[in-house]
């Protein structure tokens, strides 16, 4: 709840104070002092509110108030205090005994302000008018900072691709195979960063038969599948490498340089070999 009003506004007088009301207020304060302004009007027999009685006493009926116009000394003191304190009229009135804050404010707006303008002084800043106007013009206009969100996008350079043409020729054949290889160069490889010892280069090597054909100029005749397994019995192999005769449990070969080793069961010390028919599974 807010503060209750100081008096009943329906039964109070408004407007200018009469001489009789002034005499009653002065007589009561001289006899009893100021006291509480809320209860003073009823005790003094006045149909006024407490605020009205207080302002009437402070601004007009106090015995220490100065009557009459302001002197030149008071004018200069008000100008000096205003340059230091600004529009704080209650503080200025405290330095001028016998003058009220309301009286000083009215006197400033009606007389002293006009006096300063005639002297060429700005009443607000207390500086020469030309200097104050020049300082206001020289002040740069403060622009509101514009916030911009910048997004930096960096594109990695495209990997360089190098092409190499290679041709492979096989002896005994007139055909040539041309191979086109691509090589990519990347600036950064995340796999190499994690595993520096890992080699990811891919190479294409020639077949074993081609290496044997090209190696040291030697010509060798490959063996057929049956001959390599030793499954020829008393027959001439088509490759012409060897002839195998199986007699009983032993096998004799006409050419043992290549070895008749079926499933790795040949004896290296002797020339007698085990036949694959006489093996028993254990």
Swiss-Prot record:
InterPro entries the UniProt entry points to: Homeodomain-like_sf (IPR009057), Myb_dom (IPR017930), Myb_TF_plants (IPR015495), SANT/Myb (IPR001005)
Disulfide bridge positions per record: none
| Keyword Repeat recorded | yes
**A Gene Ontology molecular-function term?**
DNA-binding transcription factor activity
Disordered: where is this region?
A: 119-145
Q: Where is the HTH myb-type domain?
A: 9-61, 62-116
Q: Where is the composition biased (Polar residues)?
A: 130-145
- Induction of synthesis: Down-regulated by exposure to UV-B light.
Q: Which UniProt keywords apply?
A: DNA-binding, Nucleus, Repeat, Repressor, Transcription, Transcription regulation
Disrupted-gene phenotype: Defects lead to a better tolerance of UV-B irradiation due to the increase in sinapate ester accumulation.
Q: Which residues bind DNA?
A: 37-61, 89-112
**Subunit and partners:** Interacts with BHLH12/MYC1 and BHLH42/TT8. Interacts with SAD2.
So what does this one do?
Transcription repressor involved in regulation of protection against UV. Mediates transcriptional repression of CYP73A5, the gene encoding trans-cinnamate 4-monooxygenase, thereby regulating the accumulation of the UV-protectant compound sinapoylmalate.
* PANTHER family listed in its UniProt record: TRANSCRIPTION FACTOR MYB8-RELATED-RELATED, TRANSCRIPTION REPRESSOR MYB4
Which named protein is this?
Answer: Transcription repressor MYB4
Q: Which organism is it from?
A: Arabidopsis thaliana
């Amino acid at each position: 709840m807010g503060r209750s009003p100081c008096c009943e506004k329906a039964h109070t007088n408004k407007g200018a104070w009469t001489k009789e009301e002034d005499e009653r207020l002065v007589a009561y304060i001289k006899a009893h002092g100021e006291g509480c302004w809320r209860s003073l009007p009823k005790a003094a027999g006045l149909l006024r509110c407490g605020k009205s009685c207080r302002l009437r006493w402070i601004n007009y009926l106090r015995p220490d108030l100065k009557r009459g116009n302001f002197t030149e000394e008071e004018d200069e003191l008000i100008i000096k205090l205003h340059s230091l304190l600004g529009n704080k009229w209650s503080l200025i009135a405290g330095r001028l005994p016998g003058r009220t804050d309301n009286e000083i404010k009215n006197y400033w707006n009606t007389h002293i302000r006009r006096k300063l303008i005639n002297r060429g002084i700005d009443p607000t800043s207390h500086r020469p008018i030309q200097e104050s106007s020049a300082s206001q013009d020289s002040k740069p206009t403060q622009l509101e900072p514009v916030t911009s969100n910048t997004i930096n996008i960096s594109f990695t350079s495209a990997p360089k691709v190098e092409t190499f043409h290679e041709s492979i020729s096989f002896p005994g054949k007139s055909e040539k195979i041309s191979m086109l290889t691509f090589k990519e160069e990347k600036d950064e490889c995340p796999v190499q960063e994690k595993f520096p010892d890992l080699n990811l280069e891919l190479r294409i090597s020639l077949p074993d038969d081609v290496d044997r054909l090209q190696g040291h100029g030697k010509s060798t005749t490959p063996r057929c599948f049956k001959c390599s397994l030793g499954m020829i019995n008393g027959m001439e192999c088509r490759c012409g490498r060897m002839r195998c005769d199986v007699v009983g449990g032993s096998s004799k070969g006409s050419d043992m340089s290549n070895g008749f080793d079926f499933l790795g069961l040949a004896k290296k010390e002797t020339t007698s070999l085990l036949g694959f028919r006489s093996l028993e599974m254990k």
